[in-house]
Amino acid sequence: MQELGKAETNSTRIIRQDDKRVTIEKDLDTEHMVLSMGPQHPSTHGVLRLECITDGEVVVEAEPYLGYLHRCFEKHCEKIDYPAIVPYTDRMDYLAGMNNELAYCITVEKLLDIEIPRRVEFIRVIVAELNRIASHLVAIGTYAIDLGAFTPFLFCFRDREHIMSLLEWISGARMLYNYIWIGGLAYDVPADFKTRVAEFVTYFRPKAKELYQLLTENEIFVKRTYDIGIMPADVAINYGWSGPMLRGSGVKWDLRRNDPYSVYPELDFDVPVPDGKFSVVGDCLSRHLVRALEMEESLKIIEQCLDKMPEEPNFNSRALIPKKIRPKAGEVYGRAENPRGELGYYIVSDGKSTSPVRCKARSSCFVNLSAMKDLSKGQLIPDLVAIIGSIDIVLGEVDR
């Protein structure tokens, strides 16, 4: 086979020196190609399909196609009692079931206008923050493996297993907990709850720092995420972004601070946002940094809750749970800060039925994913993997 000669390159064309007849014009009007990613592609984190229109290796447009995991959540809610909806919320963002339950329960409690015991409030926050850390570990670990780093994935799932064991010990389930109930909890925590949770905090704090250094000081990981998929703050706000996605664009917005609920107003913690020293504000690396730093803040919250949680022997966590829930006629919107952003519920009651007339779930994953067109435009095809991973979607919540 004849060896190709060296190429002489300028801004508009590439010319092979050994054959003057061959001239490739880089600015030719070539035909676009349609590339389908998913719905079984590993980097889509579930049954998501992206239809990408490409010009060579450059993405012109990426359109998400949803609905493969649709399970009629909102329609089911109209046919079952208020307490029976709690297990259904677990199955939306199945990586953060405690947070889903908390958002739903505080919405119904707002409609019922009932007060929750302080011990219950502190327990709710502790399990929600444990679940937040577990969710972020999945996000960081799978993001690392998407970009070719296998070891951090193993580290993340090793540490997540400690949290899964704790939550199983508390609630009886590893994932779909059905633990936070309207007006209380399914069970009070075991006797040595404080000791075991405190031991986990002590164990995990140095691990969180190690994980932070493992990726943010990795040259390959930084090159794959730095200055990729930039979302300006004003565009992120217009899209309705929330959670680590919005904070990654430099907006210091966290419902635990800006619209506090439960006992969060009593707790001292920071809301991490990128400062532009290690990343371009709004890029994939910024979104990763926010999640990595948030785990330390969750540990601070858990420690404070352990100190402030009142000791009440023979405490009945179901004492204030109504036997039959039939709220007065009206409508209410409640929301909470989930690991992926704002999860909200809009509930309408007719005052007669034990089921809601309407239960609308506001999914942060769906809203964040809606910006995929803007995020991917002009990026290279391999960078789509980095962009999708930085959004950290769960298709169970996107489709519902």
From Swiss-Prot:
InterPro entries: NADH_Q_OxRdtase_suD, NDH1_su_D/H, NiFe-Hase_large. It catalyses: a quinone + NADH + 5 H(+)(in) = a quinol + NAD(+) + 4 H(+)(out). The keyword Translocase applies. The keyword Magnesium does not apply. It is found in: Cell inner membrane. Its EC number is 7.1.1.-. SUPFAM superfamilies: HydB/Nqo4-like. Gene3D superfamilies: Cytochrome-c3 Hydrogenase, chain B. GO terms for molecular function: NAD binding; NADH:ubiquinone reductase (non-electrogenic) activity; quinone binding. It holds the Pfam family Complex1_49kDa. Keywords: Cell inner membrane, Cell membrane, Membrane, NAD, Quinone, Translocase, Transport. One of its GO terms (cellular component) is plasma membrane. It is an enzyme of class 7 (translocase). NDH-1 shuttles electrons from NADH, via FMN and iron-sulfur (Fe-S) centers, to quinones in the respiratory chain. The immediate electron acceptor for the enzyme in this species is believed to be a menaquinone. Couples the redox reaction to proton translocation (for every two electrons transferred, four hydrogen ions are translocated across the cytoplasmic membrane), and thus conserves the redox energy in a proton gradient. NDH-1 is composed of 14 different subunits. Subunits NuoB, C, D, E, F, and G constitute the peripheral sector of the complex. Belongs to the complex I 49 kDa subunit family. This is NADH-quinone oxidoreductase subunit D.
